[in-house]
From Swiss-Prot:
NCBIfam families the UniProt entry points to: dut, PRK00601.1
PANTHER family linked: DEOXYURIDINE 5'-TRIPHOSPHATE NUCLEOTIDOHYDROLASE (PTHR11241:SF0)
Coiled coil: none
Keyword terms: Hydrolase, Magnesium, Metal-binding, Nucleotide metabolism
Species this protein is from: Pseudomonas aeruginosa (strain UCBPP-PA14)
EC numbers on record: 3.6.1.23
Protein name in UniProt: Deoxyuridine 5'-triphosphate nucleotidohydrolase
GO MF annotation terms: dUTP diphosphatase activity; magnesium ion binding
Family recorded in the similarity comment: Belongs to the dUTPase family.
Positions with a binding annotation for substrate: R70, S71, G72, N83, L87, I88, D89, M97
Catalysis: reaction(s): dUTP + H2O = dUMP + diphosphate + H(+)
Gene name per UniProt: dut
Cofactor: Mg(2+)
InterPro entries: dUTPase, dUTPase-like, dUTPase-like_sf, dUTPase_trimeric
């Protein structure tokens, strides 16, 4: 297991609400909570940038973190991430913020401390461009957008 440096920016986190944790031994994501001042209604089509009360420093350039939606919020209530996926670089040290978007047809109340997203660590492979005049031929070539099959 890797260690992450973390700062608690909202004193309610870790006292009134649990610190991010894995729900089960097989969980990939740490739950992030809405550390709002008060319960907030997110209207249909509306987006809101929500503080998590936490900053992290990954430090290892071989790792990054992804902020991903919680499946239940999206499926049951239409609440997804406004940017679809958040990328946290290894050298970022600011507060983790979650952009929530209500793509549903009904208002949704985000409660203070509610679990709104999950943080997943992923390996990073950095690459450099090797400029070429043409590529070695592949079976697929430049085919895209449905080229490999209909379903």
């Amino acid at each position: 297991m890797h260690s992450l440096q973390a700062k608690i920016l909202d004193p309610r986190l870790g006292s009134d609400f649990p610190l991010p944790q894995y729900a089960t031994p097989g969980s990939a994501g740490l739950d992030l909570r809405a550390m709002l001042k008060e319960d907030t209604v997110l209207g249909p089509g509306q987006t809101l940038l929500i503080p998590t009360g936490l900053s992290i420093y990954i430090a290892d350039p071989g790792l990054a973190a992804l902020v991903l939606p919680r499946s239940g919020l999206g499926h049951k209530h239409g609440i997804v991430l406004g940017n679809l996926v958040g990328l946290i670089d290894s050298d970022y040290q600011g507060e983790l913020m979650v952009s929530c978007w209500n793509r549903g047809e009904s208002p949704f109340t985000i409660a203070v401390g509610e679990r709104i997203a999950q943080l997943v660590l992923v390996p990073v492979v950095q690459a450099h461009f090797e400029l070429v005049e043409q590529f070695d031929e592949s079976q697929r070539g430049a085919g895209g957008f449905g080229h490999s099959g209909s379903h």
